[in-house]
Swiss-Prot record:
InterPro entries: GHMP_kinase_C_dom, GHMP_kinase_C_sf, GHMP_kinase_N_dom, IspE, Ribosomal_Su5_D2-typ_SF, Ribsml_uS5_D2-typ_fold_subgr. The gene is ispE. GO terms for molecular function: 4-(cytidine 5'-diphospho)-2-C-methyl-D-erythritol kinase activity; ATP binding. ATP binds at residues 93-103. One of its GO terms (biological process) is terpenoid biosynthetic process. Catalyzes the phosphorylation of the position 2 hydroxy group of 4-diphosphocytidyl-2C-methyl-D-erythritol. Pathway: Isoprenoid biosynthesis; isopentenyl diphosphate biosynthesis via DXP pathway; isopentenyl diphosphate from 1-deoxy-D-xylulose 5-phosphate: step 3/6. Belongs to the GHMP kinase family. IspE subfamily. This is 4-diphosphocytidyl-2-C-methyl-D-erythritol kinase. It comes from the Bacteria. It is an enzyme of class 2 (transferase). It comes from Ehrlichia chaffeensis (strain ATCC CRL-10679 / Arkansas). The keyword Ribosomal protein does not apply.
């Protein structure tokens, strides 16, 4: 039996625009992804007697989850068929706009895909079958994604503020499907694909002028998001504040570690009703 320890980083959408909808009701998106040092931990056993996915601190079915679906998909394209058992310690908030389930699926796909010599292009195609965030999480690097998540432009040299605080209302979750199903717009956001900056300095201007098109829908289900964003925008030295994904987690970016630490400390002392992470962009 082989044993592995794998980390799955949380994602943050610095902006998220909805540019249209396909006939199958999937939305076309354009989004800038970053990944942060908040990790789920996966303990993976390959070739043992157990099979399934086990969550140490959550009640989630061991067979009905993104990681199990990823394993089953990979086994269909592998020359081997061993038992795979995964124990997951969840540190990424669930149903919070941080792609925890997608990150976990991508982490197991990276590990087993490499072990079983599965072509990376096939791996990307399989990732999309699990969820629209999984191809981006497969990369876990700063990137621009469009389409339904399958069209990815890696931006490894993009210079952004490195320090980020994540804030979510305690006890509140938001289903991605619920938010998207309730999203209605008379006009979609125009595509910015032909306006992506060439110069590094212009990216922050683009990010600041962008938005999260899902915010209005998320506020209907979790109105606390509005107060979180208001407070984050008032923080000293905050570069930008926005909601990530379908919510309800919001973030603020900082150029200096000390500024992020001061902001996180202040919030932790004054807002016990909020969950706060002080993190760094990878």
């Amino acid at each position: 039996m082989l044993k592995f320890l794998v980390k799955a980083p949380a994602k943050v959408n610095l902006f998220l625009h909805i540019t249209g909808k396909r006939s199958d009701q999937h939305h076309y998106l354009e989004s800038l992804f970053v990944f942060v040092n908040v990790y789920d931990i996966l303990e993976v056993d390959v070739g043992g007697s157990k099979r399934g996915v086990y969550f140490s601190n959550l009640r989630i079915s061991k067979y009905n989850n993104t990681v199990y679906k990823a394993i089953e998909l990979l086994l269909k394209h592998s020359a081997v068929c061993p038992n795979v058992s995964v124990s997951i310690i969840k540190n990424i908030l669930v149903s919070a706009g941080l792609a925890g389930g997608s990150a976990d699926a991508a982490a197991i796909m990276r590990l087993l895909g490499n072990m079983w010599n599965i072509d990376y292009t096939l791996l990307q195609d399989l990732a999309l079958k699990i969820g629209s965030d999984v191809p981006a999480c497969l990369e876990s690097k700063t990137l621009f994604a469009k389409g339904v998540g399958e069209d990815i432009l890696l931006l490894p040299d993009l210079l952004l503020p490195k320090y980020i605080i994540l804030v979510a209302p305690r006890g509140k979750t938001l289903s991605t499907a619920k938010v998207f199903n309730n999203y209605q717009s008379a006009t979609y956001s125009p595509s910015i694909c032909d306006k992506l900056p060439v110069k590094q300095d212009d990216w922050m201007e683009l990010i600041c002028n962008a938005k999260n098109d899902l915010l209005e829908v998320a506020l209907k289900f979790v109105p606390e998001i509005e107060e979180i964003l208001f407070v984050l925008k008032q923080l000293k030295n905050s570069v930008i504040a926005r909601m990530t994904g379908s919510g309800a987690t919001c973030f603020a970016l900082f150029n200096e570690l000390s500024h992020a630490e001061d902001a996180a400390r202040k919030l932790q002392m004054t807002r016990p009703d909020w969950i706060i992470f002080n993190a760094k962009i990878l």
